[in-house]
């Protein structure tokens, strides 16, 4: 709350919007990158038993925590793979949905990450998620610059809501984007060609 200046309702609102790109009763292939500790998504994946979910993270420690959560929930449809979002080890068009919660502000090579996510998404597929954008909340911007960057949690440069919308519109056929304080959420659909 101190950093993001959000109450629980605001936090829940941006997460709900970010996850709204995953269709109800989804039964396709989903890539989550980065999975982090899985705290936000493992309970959701319990409701998607017919889907094929791959969770990728650069950090073996974070991924291990997510895998423990999946094991506790007896998730049989979720697999884990260590890797780099800038060089995804998947074929072109391998996924129906790519989900990225709170990741892009940390990725060191954001251009490669955007390119790779687009590459592994099938035509007509959905890219959805959320991450920090600068210029929406002064207090958050200060913490990011003076605390999180030094701890290695965030890596500049950062998008603004405007630059993110423009970037996504260059790649995707449809883009829905909003902000809640310093967080942007988005749902994009890749064109059919």
What are the residue ranges of the model-derived segments?
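C-terminal alpha-helical "lid/dimerization" subdomain adjacent to the S-adenosyl-L-methionine
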Residues: 2-8, 128-180, 184-186
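Conserved class I S-adenosyl-L-methionine
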Residues: 1-26, 39, 43, 142-148
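C-terminal lobe and adjacent flexible extensions of AdoMet/dcAdoMet transferase-like proteins
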Residues: 187-193
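Class I SAM-dependent methyltransferase SAM/SAH-binding core
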Residues: 29-87
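A short SAM/SAH-binding and catalytic strip from SAM-dependent methyltransferases
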Residues: 97-109
